[in-house]
Amino acid sequence: MDIAIQHPWFKRALGPFYPSRLFDQFFGEGLFEYDLLPFLSSTISPYYRQSLFRTVLDSGISEVRSDRDKFVIYLDVKHFSPEDLTVKVLEDFVEIHGKHNERQDDHGYISREFHRRYRLPSNVDQSALSCSLSADGMLTFSGPKVPSGMDAGHSERAIPVSREEKPSSAPSS
């Protein structure tokens, strides 16, 4: 099986229609020079085109789904263990915070931290919220919706993160 290996110089953004990785959720995976100067690098090789869809798919952006029966958030947190994650419900919001202290890896020392806040729909049953972390690092936060007119129960509380031994079945966009 042949695997194409691409030098980082060729993996740069080419202007306003090609998003930068600067604000993506690559928690500490490093930045290339084109992340800081995306327009400058496009003048070097004007005929090279980076795949827009590959950039979007690899960006690690969270996915929020809300249908008639349930509300679900998928978030890639592959660099964090359940002990590093805190999930809280504060009134109509869920706050997901991940932090691990400085530790050594192959390239030196690294520490990571992120904070995400999502608005919960008003009809989500907050007493039945759950959160799990799959073996491949996909955090799944979910809660059922109650029929309109019923009390969804809003309060402040922490949601424990359980670990699953199987990879995530989250749909890829």
Swiss-Prot record:
Record PTM N6-acetyllysine, positions in chain: 70, 99
Region feature Disordered, mapped onto this chain: 144-173
Cellular component, GO annotation: cytoplasm; nucleus
Region described as Required for complex formation with BFSP1 and BFSP2: 1-63
Binding sites annotated in the UniProt record for Zn(2+) 2: 107
GO biological process terms held by the UniProt record: lens development in camera-type eye; negative regulation of apoptotic process; protein refolding; response to heat
Function: Contributes to the transparency and refractive index of the lens. Acts as a chaperone, preventing aggregation of various proteins under a wide range of stress conditions. Required for the correct formation of lens intermediate filaments as part of a complex composed of BFSP1, BFSP2 and CRYAA.
Protein name: Alpha-crystallin A chain
Source organism, top-level taxon: Eukaryota
Principal localisation: cytoplasm
Modified how: Acetylation at Lys-70 may increase chaperone activity. Undergoes age-dependent proteolytical cleavage at the C-terminus.
Feature: compositional bias, Basic and acidic residues: 153-167
GO molecular function: metal ion binding; structural constituent of eye lens; unfolded protein binding
